[in-house]
């Protein structure tokens, strides 16, 4: 389904609530689709009424859909290029991980998949696989009433049986809407969640995007001192290596009620379906089945406690007209040279405004498959010993105010230091005893010196050395993070040659003036024996999906010509690229319109 437009239909789809449909559709990037759609039907109208829309709007939606042929009944005979069947009756509880959202594991198979095992705990110490972060988070799961009510009911059941969250677990609740907190309060479930440590920390993007905040210093020290295998469990969309927290070596995605259960278990080694959470007063083991609420109970709570007025009270004030009677603001921003949050951007000056040579490019990195935007530009907490941390300290910020990479995206001097700053990066140019060394590392050529990635970037920037990146399949998957393209462009990368690109990231590369090139089938960095000592030229006319020539100049003086596919897919993309990127193109169009 990669790059496909999906439309769900059938008996199962018609029975899904709109909240469940939205949860599925919001995961479209994770299963690689361009879009995931459901038809308009009575479930749609029911949701509009539940969320407080005016009856006139509900009627308009129904009338418009029926008049335009978009109503479910009129799509019953629609023909599709491909039809994939999925039986909803086969759905069971799952988690996803480690490291990728598509690594689905049924909770009944945790032991056979090597995730759960013997829980080896020493009194006073965290166990192997300790869950250091348990977060009910993400715009996807927290806007689904069934998921949130299920989490609240599981918390209530756990509290009644005397279960508690393990002390090393940092737990949080970040609903995607204030309406969620209102209906949890209405159902008397918010106090139950708070009792287990799941109080509301924000109505915003938090742990899912690597912004969980700092760990308890004592817990952090133990993780470092013992080199502990620590994990995170969250109800987010993505769990790529290094994304959630620098000290969570791996992360697992789970539903909100499972997140609560893992906070009580305290370790990913716990077999969540089979192991005992504790004992009842009469000595009976407490298992997940004893905590999990029934569908009937969830439905009853939703019917009683989720009300239209909750949504109206949250959203109606957002659309009220307000007149600002304050001081007039200058139309031009007054740049502050000491700011680490917003700084005058460099995209229209210096090397970024100059012509890309496509000659003599040296590899900044040679990478494998499935490189994510979290590898390219992480968004999580900034550590003191990182390049960005050292820069912020030099700017006078105390460590507790470093915040996350995501919050400093308006300051290119901070944000560009995030380029390849993921400690889980595997740059095949950096090896020890024949094995690739994990870390934010690079090898500067022609000297062959291994150093931190940012120092290598600075070295090449000072030399005005044009750069290239060589990669495997699915380059740039994950969040559509603009800095994953901005960072490499600021570093001096002119082209990226990969076996394949994630759709949105390829578009972002074009928008930043970085040329995406694709190896032809059967050709890879491995078949070409690329080790990073080479220099590269790109020859040919850059037209939509043209075949260009990648010239590889070997260290021994030999050269090799390799055909590659130009992934400027349209004439418009070619125009944007040749202008230097979308920002330069915008500036050109603006100046031309002013001159006209």
Give the residues covered by each predicted segment.
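Conserved phosphate/anionic-ligand binding catalytic regions in large, soluble enzymes, centered on
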Residues: 18-40, 99, 132-150, 203-208, ...
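Hydrophobic alpha-helical bundle architecture
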Residues: 192, 199, 215-225, 234-235, ...
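Mobile "lid/hinge" segments at catalytic clefts and subdomain interfaces of large enzymes
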Residues: 1-62, 71, 149, 155-170, ...
């Amino acid at each position: 389904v990669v790059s496909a437009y999906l439309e769900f239909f059938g008996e199962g789809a018609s029975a899904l609530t709109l909240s469940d449909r939205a949860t599925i559709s919001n995961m479209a990037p994770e299963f690689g689709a361009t879009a995931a759609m459901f038809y308009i039907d009575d479930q749609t109208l029911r949701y509009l009424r539940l969320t407080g829309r005016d009856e006139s709007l509900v009627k308009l939606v129904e009338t418009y859909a029926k008049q335009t042929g978009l109503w479910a009944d009129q799509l019953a005979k629609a023909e599709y290029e491909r039809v994939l069947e999925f039986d909803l009756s086969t759905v069971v509880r799952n988690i996803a991980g480690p490291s990728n959202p598509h690594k689905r594991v049924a909770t009944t198979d945790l032991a056979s998949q090597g995730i759960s095992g013997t829980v080896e705990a020493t009194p006073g110490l965290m166990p192997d696989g300790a869950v250091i972060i348990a977060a009910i988070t993400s715009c996807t799961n927290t806007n689904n009433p069934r998921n949130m009510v299920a989490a609240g009911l599981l918390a209530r059941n756990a509290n009644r049986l005397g279960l508690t969250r393990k002390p090393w677990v940092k737990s949080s609740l970040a609903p995607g809407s204030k309406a969620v907190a209102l209906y949890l309060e209405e159902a008397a479930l918010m106090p139950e969640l708070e009792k287990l440590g799941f109080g509301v920390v924000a109505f915003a993007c938090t742990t899912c995007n690597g912004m969980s905040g700092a760990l308890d210093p004592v817990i952090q020290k133990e993780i470092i001192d013992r080199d502990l295998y620590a994990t995170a469990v969250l109800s987010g969309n993505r769990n790529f290596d290094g994304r959630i927290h620098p000290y969570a070596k791996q992360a697992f995605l789970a539903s909100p009620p499972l997140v609560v259960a893992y906070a009580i278990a305290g370790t990913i080694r716990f077999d969540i379906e089979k192991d005992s959470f504790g004992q009842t007063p009469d000595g009976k083991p407490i298992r997940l089945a004893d905590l999990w609420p029934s569908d009937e109970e969830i439905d009853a709570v939703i019917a009683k406690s989720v009300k239209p007025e909750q949504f109206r009270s949250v959203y109606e004030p957002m659309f009220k007209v307000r007149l600002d009677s304050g001081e007039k603001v200058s139309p031009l921003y007054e740049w502050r040279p000491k700011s680490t949050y917003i700084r005058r951007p460099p995209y229209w000056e210096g090397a970024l405004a100059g012509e890309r040579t496509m000659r003599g490019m040296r590899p900044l990195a040679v990478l494998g498959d499935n490189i994510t935007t979290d590898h390219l530009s992480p968004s999580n907490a900034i550590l003191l010993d990182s390049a960005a941390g050292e820069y912020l300290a030099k700017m006078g910020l105390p460590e507790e105010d470093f915040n996350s990479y995501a919050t400093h995206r308006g300051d290119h001097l901070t944000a560009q230091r995030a380029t390849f700053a993921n400690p889980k990066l595997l740059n095949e140019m950096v090896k020890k005893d024949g094995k690739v060394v994990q870390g934010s590392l690079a090898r500067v050529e022609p000297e062959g010196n291994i150093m931190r990635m940012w120092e290598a970037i600075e070295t090449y920037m000072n030399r005005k050395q044009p750069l290239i990146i060589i990669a495997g399949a699915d380059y740039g998957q994950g969040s559509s993070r603009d800095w994953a393209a901005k960072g490499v462009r600021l570093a001096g990368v002119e082209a990226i040659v990969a076996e394949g690109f994630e759709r949105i990231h390829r578009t972002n590369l074009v928008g930043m003036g970085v040329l995406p090139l694709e190896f032809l089938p059967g050709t890879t960095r491995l078949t070409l024996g690329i080790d990073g000592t080479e220099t590269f030229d790109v020859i040919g006319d850059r037209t939509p999906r043209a075949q260009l020539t990648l010239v590889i100049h070997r260290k021994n003086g030999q050269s090799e010509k390799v055909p590659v596919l130009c992934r400027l897919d349209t004439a418009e993309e070619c125009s944007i690229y040749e202008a230097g990127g979308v920002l330069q193109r915008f500036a050109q169009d603006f100046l031309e319109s002013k001159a006209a």
